[in-house]
């Protein structure tokens, strides 16, 4: 229970948009040094003492932003927990197919040359259709036909 109590963060009513990387635009003006009476000096000392007391009670800005980020993350994780359970139930109900089990899926298309190359013609057959007839005629006229390209000539 103590672990949970340490995680609670008290949020102030107004949160500014000051971050660690912000830069002050104006610097505080220095007060002119005048001769102060003893009463004014005592009042300033009392104010300084009160400021020191409130410094212990105040939460620094990086700690506030860390607390807010933790709260947002906890909301996200809670919503993800509920969303995952709903999706898992739907997947179990709708999917009747398991990975790795043979199915009755048929192969309907081939990648690559489709014109004369099919499994029925076998390997090495149908390559003649890939060579344009103009090149075959030019090669036949010069009698420089490669026997591997056109074995019938």
Swiss-Prot record:
Gene3D superfamilies noted in UniProt: CRIB domain
Quote the protein name from its UniProt record: CRIB domain-containing protein RIC4
- What region holds the CRIB domain? 99-112
GO cellular component annotations, sorted alphabetically? apical plasma membrane; plasma membrane
Under the heading InterPro entries, the entry gives:
CRIB_dom (IPR000095), CRIB_dom_sf (IPR036936), RIC2/4 (IPR044509)
Compartment annotation:
Cell membrane
A GO biological process held by the record: regulation of actin filament polymerization
Q: What induces it?
A: By the root-colonizing endophytic fungus P.indica.
Q: Which CDD domains match?
A: CRIB
Q: How does it sit in the membrane?
A: Peripheral membrane protein
Further remarks about this protein from its record: Over-expression of RIC4 in tobacco germinating pollen induces depolarized pollen tube growth.
Phenotype reported upon loss of the gene: Increased rate of seed germination.
Lineage runs:
Eukaryota, Viridiplantae, Streptophyta, Embryophyta, Tracheophyta
Superkingdom field: Eukaryota
Major location (coarse): membrane
PANTHER family in the record: CRIB DOMAIN-CONTAINING PROTEIN RIC2 (PTHR46931), CRIB DOMAIN-CONTAINING PROTEIN RIC4 (PTHR46931:SF6)
Gene source species: Arabidopsis thaliana
Q: What does this protein do?
A: Functions as a downstream effector of Rho-related GTP binding proteins of the 'Rho of Plants' (ROPs) family. Participates in the propagation of ROP GTPase signals in specific cellular responses. Required for actin cortical microfilament assembly. Activated by ARAC4/ROP2 to promote the assembly of cortical actin microfilaments required for lobe formation and lateral expansion of pavement cells. Interaction with, and activation by ARAC4/ROP2 is inhibited by RIC1.
Assembly state and interactors?
Answer: Interacts with ARAC4/ROP2 and ARAC11/ROP1.
Where is it made, tissue-wise?
Expressed in roots, leaves, stems, flowers, siliques and pollen.
Going by the UniProt record, its keywords in alphabetical order are:
Cell membrane, Developmental protein, Growth regulation, Membrane
> Pfam families, from UniProt?
PBD
